[in-house]
From Swiss-Prot:
EC identifiers of the protein: 4.1.2.4
Similarity remark: Belongs to the DeoC/FbaB aldolase family. DeoC type 1 subfamily.
Keywords: Cytoplasm, Lyase, Schiff base
Catalytic residues (positions): D92, K154, K182
GO biological process: 2-deoxyribose 1-phosphate catabolic process; carbohydrate catabolic process; deoxyribonucleotide catabolic process
Recorded GO MF terms: deoxyribose-phosphate aldolase activity
Function: Catalyzes a reversible aldol reaction between acetaldehyde and D-glyceraldehyde 3-phosphate to generate 2-deoxy-D-ribose 5-phosphate.
UniProt name for this protein: Deoxyribose-phosphate aldolase
Residues spanning the signal sequence: none
């Protein structure tokens, strides 16, 4: 796989609280320069990213219910609508992990369905936070996502105790079939990214995108 091909797997990510306008501007410039698929940013920076990415092919991805997923469903749906109105091209929502742990599967499904409906055709990725789930819970969550028809299931926020693993990516891909799988959290070098893709990942979320495509190791990135 060439570096240009690998770049098209990457959502170039900056989600930590301290990121300032210059950081986001740099992120956008890097995404254009290296041909990344998208930038993944908090929704408050969508207008800035829209301005910086004008005329390019780079998409704007934003997060909803991030990073805990425990918001009211109505708030997630509203957040989604506002983000799309501002210019988001893709939505990454966090599943309600607490409801999964409470076995409230109907509520989990309704939560995702509400955001899916609010997307109104905008691609939706559902973050499972796999490090907190059992294998059975991962499968069940993936089955719900597949039934609803979301665009992707995603491993992690990158803000919890663990990120993507090859094992979890393979399990997710096996469960969802043709739906996309996004590996995120801890993917910081070419070898790891390629292992995730081999396991079934069709998108990589990373703040170390430049290191991934250049074959270097990034020890500074947090996502």
């Amino acid at each position: 796989m060439t570096s240009n091909q690998l770049a098209q797997y990457i959502d170039h990510t900056a989600l930590t609280a301290e990121k300032n306008e210059q950081d986001i501007s740099t992120l956008c410039n890097e995404a254009i320069e290296h041909g990344f698929y998208s930038v993944c940013i908090n929704s408050g920076y969508i207008p800035l990213a829209k301005e910086k990415l004008a005329g390019s092919n780079v998409k704007i991805c934003t997060v909803v219910g991030f990073p805990l997923g425990a918001n009211l469903t109505s708030v997630k749906a509203f957040e989604t609508q506002e983000a799309i109105k501002a210019g988001a091209n893709e939505i990454d929502m966090v599943i309600n992990v607490g409801w999964i742990k409470s076995q409230k599967w109907d509520a989990v499904k309704q939560d995702i369905q509400a955001v899916f409906n609010a997307c109104n055709g905008t691609p939706l990725k559902v973050i499972l936070e796999t490090c907190l789930l059992t294998k059975d819970e991962i499968v069940k969550a993936c089955e719900i996502c597949k039934e609803i028809g979301v665009a992707f299931v995603k491993t992690s926020t990158g803000f919890n105790k663990g990120g993507a693993t090859v094992e979890d990516v393979a399990l997710m891909k096996q469960t969802v079939g043709n739906i996309g799988v996004k590996a995120s959290g801890g993917v910081r070098d070419t070898e790891t990214a390629l292992a995730m893709i081999k396991a079934g990942a069709t998108r990589i979320g990373a703040s170390a995108g430049i290191a991934i495509i250049s074959g270097t190791q990034d020890t500074q990135s947090t996502y």
